[in-house]
A protein has these predicted regions:
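Flexible, surface-exposed loop/gating regions in the mature catalytic domains
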Residues: 38-332
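Bacterial N-terminal signal peptides that target proteins for export
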Residues: 1-9
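C-terminal motif of bacterial Sec signal peptides marking the signal peptidase cleavage site
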Residues: 15-18
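Extracellular mucin-like PTS domains
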Residues: 25-45
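Bacterial signal peptide processing site
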Residues: 20-23
Length: 332
């Protein structure tokens, strides 16, 4: 006799399960309109910080960090610049004396210039070469630069003592590829030092001139804290002279950088053996970080890396392993 019990049992169980489901009404209730709306409400997006469209780098001279940051004698740096900017508390120079540090800012290495202030015409690749290849605009404004009007001046210093121009502080004139011809005449200019009658009021240096993507500003030796007051006389000199120069020019520089630009104020070197230097990052678009500090370790390769990242350029030498300076524009 054929046994059908298993088939019958399975059928009975399926029928019982169906009846149980129907009779008890156990099923997921449709979500309420409130639940549906809540589950599909998009989270607000937070705008990411953006790269600046203009970068201005102002380089001062020979000042250890603790003689700049918090120095009550430097009224403008302490009273205006620091509250408006991000202060980098662990920035260090890479070499000594001055010249190799300026090379490092543009090449991520000293290119064999360590220990020399006259090792011009370096042949290693530089930021300026990168920008020229991509057609990105750049200018170096050196205060007291004797060249111009189609001429390129490559002398070590200016012919007049009162000018206090020094080639060793002009980054692009330290490389053979950008210290002659059109690369020099088109990009290196005298800083338009438009002072008031008594030399004390803030000025508008560029008078609406459209700044390129990258601008270096190099004050002369009496305005960059390099020369002492006794060397500069009426030009004041020393750290007080540099603070006064910044008080006349800072507003113009930050304004001319535009609403999405940044100004990096840094020093070439500090003190032998330490090279701890001050650096401030400001500009119209950085007001959200004004008066704050960053304690991460940075150096001149970090400056180069930040510029390369902002301009979409590949890294050079030491910049490849460097932490970029925090120059991103915070979202509003």
């Amino acid at each position: 006799m054929t046994r059908r019990t298993p088939t019958l049992t399975i059928s009975v169980l399926l029928l019982a399960a169906a009846c149980s489901s129907t009779s008890t009404g156990v099923s997921a209730a449709p979500p309420s309109p409130t639940q549906t709306a809540a589950s599909h409400t998009p989270k607000p997006t937070v705008a990411a910080p953006t790269q600046p469209d203009k970068i201005v780098v102002v380089v001062m001279e020979n000042s250890p960090y603790d003689t700049i940051a918090g120095n009550p004698a430097l009224h403008f740096i302490g009273g205006t610049i620091a509250p408006q900017t991000l202060t980098l508390t662990q920035m260090h120079a890479d070499s000594a004396p001055s010249l190799p540090n300026y090379v490092w800012m543009a090449a991520g290495q000293s290119c064999g210039a360590d220990g020399s202030d006259t090792a011009f015409d370096r042949t290693c690749p530089s930021l300026f070469d990168q920008m020229d290849r991509k057609g990105i605009g750049w200018t170096v404004y050196a205060e007291g630069y004797p060249g111009g009007a189609g001429s390129c001046f490559t002398g070590v210093s200016s012919d007049t003592a009162s000018n206090d121009y020094a080639r060793k502080h002009v980054p692009s004139l330290l490389f053979s590829s950008t210290s002659a011809g059109a690369a020099c005449t088109s990009h290196v200019k005298n800083f338009p030092n438009d002072t008031s009658a008594d030399g004390s009021a803030p000025v508008n240096n560029f008078k609406g001139v459209h700044l390129p993507a990258l601008t270096f500003v190099i004050p002369n030796l009496c305005h960059d804290m390099h020369n002492s007051a006794s060397q500069c006389g009426a030009a004041q000199g020393g750290q007080a002279g540099g603070d006064l120069w910044l008080s006349r020019n800072w507003a113009s520089l930050t304004q001319d950088a535009g609403p999405h630009g940044v100004v990096i104020l840094t020093w070439d070197e500090g003190q032998p053996g330490s090279e701890h230097i001050a650096t401030f990052i400001g500009g119209a678009g950085t007001s959200a970080i004004g008066g704050t500090q960053d304690g991460h370790a940075y150096d001149h390769s970090s400056t180069l890396r930040a510029i390369e990242d902002a301009l979409g350029l590949p890294c050079l030498a030491g910049a490849c392993g460097a932490t970029p300076l925090p120059i991103l524009i915070p979202a509003n």
